[in-house]
Regions:
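Active-site anion-handling motifs in enzyme catalytic cores
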Residues: 1-413
Length: 413
């Protein structure tokens, strides 16, 4: 299909446009369904097939969308669009994150009303107990029905790795292609990452929870870091706020992004990344940094294995708990991560992986672009509180607390 005639509709884009929403962590992350990393998938797909964010036709959050009033959107997609992209992450799981449940029946009904070819790229299975050969038997029946139904609407489903392929095959679904994640390929075919000498490392963390020192720059993504997002973005200082948390925010070492371009621009200040966030690792790699992912779940394991993303998933500080206790332990952990970071293997595998992804797109008669994308500046920016404002709020907070204590003491006497 020519790019001129191509007009996609994105369902569950997880993108946020304009001013970042609201004054709570929940409202801020609502378009992204609770995790800013989700938006990276659609961002990459738009770069791949469209090349422009202006006028994007999309529904941001399928979990909160009112499908009872979806007639107008479905009719628009049917009349004006050529394809519907259903953006999913690791929803092949026994229970979803944050107590959510994808509205399977409503999504399937909406797609049928649209009457257009459906494209899915980046779907994964997630077993927190590792690669369970009986995992497919433990999935909710409604999810299994949904997977079979949407597979019939797609020419092929782009999936994350070998474990997902095994699960789908055991469910009787065969029209899939392993691609990893679209986000991994958003910078185009020529990407190479160089590893600096260990003595020159200037690392950033893909989650602040693994090491809590105020001097350690880190990226926040979801509700696991709610208290830190509340502090850094909204300036809310909780009772008993640890000193290192406050000073970490005041130094600008806690950041969150809804625009992947800004995310990568921040990461370019550093030359190494590590931590449990797989999309945090991918953002770092696309910013030119070697990165090591320390997550242990199957979602991460299969995608890192397929894409050759360096991974360190053993030892006491994998995942999020316990946090690394001190600078000495962090130094040792950093050394282990550095030694595990095989950028040569990743660089060598990338050209063939990129061609595989390109084949997935073009074999469905979709236009294929790569590289620059117009109007990415339309995506929302998140501004963290500055040092002066946070200190002013801290002084005011202490004054209010002191006044409340004096009043309580006076009332008791």
């Amino acid at each position: 299909m020519s790019a001129k005639n191509f007009k996609p509709f994105f369902l569950n884009s997880n993108l946020s446009f304009g001013k970042a929403g609201g004054d709570t962590v929940e409202s801020l992350l609502r378009p992204a369904a609770g995790n800013s990393g989700n938006s990276y998938i659609t961002y990459a797909l738009v770069k791949t097939v469209l090349g422009d964010f202006a006028g994007l036709s999309h529904i941001a959050n399928a979990y909160e969308y009112d499908f009872s009033a979806s007639g107008r959107d479905a009719e628009f997609a049917r009349a004006e669009c050529t394809h519907v992209f259903l953006v999913l992450q690791d929803q092949i799981r026994i229970e979803e994150s944050y107590g959510l449940r994808l509205p399977y029946e409503n999504i399937a009904s909406f797609l049928k009303k649209c009457g257009k070819p459906v494209v899915i790229a980046g779907l994964g299975a997630n077993s927190f107990g590792g690669f369970d050969p009986e995992f497919h038997k433990k999935l909710p029946p409604a999810l299994v029905k949904f997977l079979r139904e949407i597979s019939g609407m797609c020419e092929k489903i782009g999936i994350r790795g070998e474990f997902t392929a095994d699960v789908l095959a055991k469910l009787g679904i065969s029209n899939f292609q392993i691609i990893g994640c679209p986000s991994f390929f958003e910078t185009g075919p020529g990407r190479r990452v160089e590893k600096p000498p260990f003595g020159e490392l200037n690392p950033a963390l893909t989650s602040p929870l693994i090491y809590r020192a105020e001097s350690a720059p880190a990226l926040m993504q979801d509700f696991l870091e709610k208290r830190l997002i509340d502090l850094a973005v909204f300036g809310r200082i909780p009772d008993g706020c640890p000193r290192e948390e406050f000073y970490r925010a005041a130094r600008g070492n806690l950041q969150i992004f809804l625009n992947p371009e800004s995310w990568k621009a921040f990461l370019k200040k550093f030359n190494f990344a590590l931590g449990p966030r797989v999309h945090g690792s991918i953002a770092a790699i696309n910013a030119g940094l070697p990165a090591v992912c320390t997550n242990t779940d199957s979602r991460t394991a299969e995608m890192c294995a397929f894409l050759k993303i360096p991974r360190l998933a053993d030892g006491p500080y994998a995942d999020y708990k316990p946090p690394i206790p001190d600078a000495r332990e962090f130094g040792a952990f950093l050394r282990r991560a550095y030694d595990a970071c095989d950028v040569d293997a990743m660089n060598a595998a990338y050209p063939a992986l990129f061609e595989n992804y390109k084949n997935f797109i073009t074999s469905q008669n979709l236009p294929f672009r790569c590289g620059e994308c117009a109007n990415a500046g339309m995506l929302s920016e998140v501004k963290v509180r500055g040092r002066i404002e946070l200190f002013a709020r801290r002084i005011a907070f202490k004054a209010r607390r002191s006044a409340a204590k004096r009043l309580l003491k006076r009332n008791r006497s």
